[in-house]
Amino acid sequence: MKKLPLFLLLLVCLLCCGKKKAVEELSPGHTVTIQAGDIKAVFADNTEFGVHRAWYNGVAFLSHKADTVNIFRPRVAGLNFEHIFDGQKWWEPAEVLFEPRACPMSIQRISDRTAELHQGPTSLHKLESWTRFTVTDPHYIDMEFTCIPRAETFDRGYIGLFWASYINTKVDKGYYFIGRKTVEDQKQWVEINSPAHNIESSVRYELDERDPGFVEGYPPRLFNNYMDYRYSYPFYYGRRGKMAWMLMFEQAGPVRFSHSPTSGAPVGPGTEPAWDFHYLFYDYKVGEKYGFKARLVYKPFVSREDIIEEYENWSGEKVEMP
């Protein structure tokens, strides 16, 4: 038997080694798995698979080399597009209350680092949206959300959108931001750890004086109950064990932070928190594009100075603390 020339052997070796192994999806057509840098993420549409429940679009799984356990509760998700609201209509049944979850949604892999969710005009508010997730070295998920209102259905002139992240922890339920009660006060680190679901559950920007308005009798929700403190910079972080989970946004004002100590359950032992946010787009016009960019950071916690540095490097803004 003839031996292959050395250069041919090297060529075969290079071709074999350079060939990427195909990712086996948890639910083909409904999930996109991306492993890059230090993190692994599974993005999902509204379809049920395995232990993962239907309606929980977003990031179904997120782990880090330093902690391979899912940061999110296994049956649900993080960065889950949960509510569309206008302050006027009160929703029932659940299919309307959780409109982005209940309406059809598709997912596709854009590249080896990017997945995109698409939802056609929804049943009640006729809002079409695209959510693009890109995994960036070494420990980031960049999120870009775009939406277009296809009809004049938001009765009070603004578009309200809400995202939930269900954290897999029973301790350290609060998260932290830099803020103050008034602009005359000194900035400080503040923890939001609301006493119960829908009580003192959201945080506004310190210069945000616009009131979206809710019709009289509108039930209490996470997005219409506020704590006294306001945030000074559009980022917050929480901790699970040795890990830090951080969200930062490109623009202060339209984004408001939200929190639930129990993810909607009654207060009690064994409950797990939700570290949420919502966006408000005022004076909307049918057919116009609206959106935002955000970055999720997931890595071992180093210090609060390191958290600030992450935000400064990404935003280009200098954080000033006393």
Language model: regions and residue ranges:
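Beta-strand-rich N-terminal accessory domains
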Residues: K19-L79
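C-terminal motif of bacterial Sec signal peptides marking the signal peptidase cleavage site
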Residues: L14-C16
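Sec-dependent signal peptide recognition
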Residues: K2-L9
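Beta-strand-rich recognition/accessory modules
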Residues: A22-G37, D208-P322
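An extended acidic
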Residues: H52-E116
